Amino acid sequence: LPGKRVFSAATSARMRQLMRMIVVDGTGRKADALGYRVGGKTGSAEKPGVGGYSRNLVVATFAAAFPMDNPRYVVLTMLDEPKGTEASSFQRTAGYTAAPVVQKTITRIGPLLGIIPDMKRDVDVSELMPLLWKAKGE
C-alpha cells in the first residue's frame, strides 16, 4: 500500500538483514521455516511478583515477519509462563518456546497464503556475521 516512508530504504534493508540474522544464527534459530526467509526478534521477561520480579515465571515472545526480502506477513507469538521440556533442556526463554511455535505456524500458513518455499533465495547477512557475538567454543 502506498504511504509516507518513515525509514529510509537503506535503514529498512538493514533492519530486515538484522532480523533475518537473528533467525539464521541468533536466538531465533528455532523459528526458521525453511524456504520462507523468516526474520524476527525474541523477547523473554520475568513476570512481576510481590517484592520484585519472579525468577521462575516468564513471558516469552517471538515477533516474526516473512519473507524478509519482501515482508508481507507478521506472526507474533506470546507464551505466558511457558514450561521448558526435555527437548529444550528445560529452558523457558523465547528462543526455545515461542520461536518453534512461529516456525510451525509459518510452515502451515505459508502455503495457504500462496507463498511457495524457495530454498534458492535468502537475505544476504554475510556482512553482518562478524558483528554476531559468539560464546567461546561455539
Name the predicted role of every residue range.
Residues 6, 14-17, 21, 124-138:
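Acidic, Ser/Thr-rich low-complexity intrinsically disordered segments
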